[in-house]
């Protein structure tokens, strides 16, 4: 028997009807004592999990503000960091800015995150909201 390449097999499958393919799969499972259900279930779970992740992203209510870099106007960024993060002294704010990327605010609402991002970007910093 001549060995068929993957392309040859795919071409043969393309010419078959769904009913014929279904019968082929049943015979394949019986002949080799395998099941095609496990890979199909995993593949089906993938998009469902992705859809759930996308839905969770839409409903996200808590955000993290991360300082990626201070940019060229470091002093202005330090001042804004002291304003945004309560209880920071000058040295702590400077250390935080110098050690970027660092989270500045964690689990804040969208308005607070966008407000902080706007102030930091106006001061010359690079910021991401996650």
Swiss-Prot record:
* KW Calcium (keyword) present: no
Q: What biological-process terms (Gene Ontology) are attached?
A: translation
Gene3D superfamilies in the record, alphabetically?
3.30.1390.10, Single helix bin (1.20.5.710)
Q: Specify the superkingdom.
A: Bacteria
Give a GO cellular-component term: cytosolic large ribosomal subunit
Q: Show the GO MF annotations.
A: mRNA binding; structural constituent of ribosome
- Keywords recorded for this protein, A-Z: Ribonucleoprotein, Ribosomal protein
Job of this protein = Forms part of the ribosomal stalk which helps the ribosome interact with GTP-bound translation factors. Is thus essential for accurate translation.
* Quaternary organization: Homodimer. Part of the ribosomal stalk of the 50S ribosomal subunit. Forms a multimeric L10(L12)X complex, where L10 forms an elongated spine to which 2 to 4 L12 dimers bind in a sequential fashion. Binds GTP-bound translation factors.
Per the record, the similarity remark reads: Belongs to the bacterial ribosomal protein bL12 family.
Which HAMAP family would you find in this protein's record? Ribosomal_bL12
Task: Tell me the protein's name.
Answer: Large ribosomal subunit protein bL12
Organism, by scientific name, is Mycolicibacterium vanbaalenii (strain DSM 7251 / JCM 13017 / BCRC 16820 / KCTC 9966 / NRRL B-24157 / PYR-1)
Protein encoded by which gene:
rplL
């Amino acid at each position: 028997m001549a060995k068929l390449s993957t392309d040859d097999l795919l071409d043969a499958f393309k010419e078959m009807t769904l009913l014929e393919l279904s019968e082929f799969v049943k015979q394949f499972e019986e002949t080799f004592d395998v099941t095609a259900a496990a890979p199909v279930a995993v593949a089906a779970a993938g998009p469902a999990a992705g859809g759930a992740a996308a839905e969770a992203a839409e409903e996200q209510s808590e955000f993290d503000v991360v300082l990626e870099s201070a940019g060229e106007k470091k002093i202005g960024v330090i001042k804004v960091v002291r304003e945004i993060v309560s209880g920071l002294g000058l040295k702590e704010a400077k250390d935080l800015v110098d050690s970027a990327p660092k989270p500045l605010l964690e689990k804040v609402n969208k308005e607070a995150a966008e407000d902080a991002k706007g102030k930091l970007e106006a001061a010359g910093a690079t910021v991401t909201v996650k």
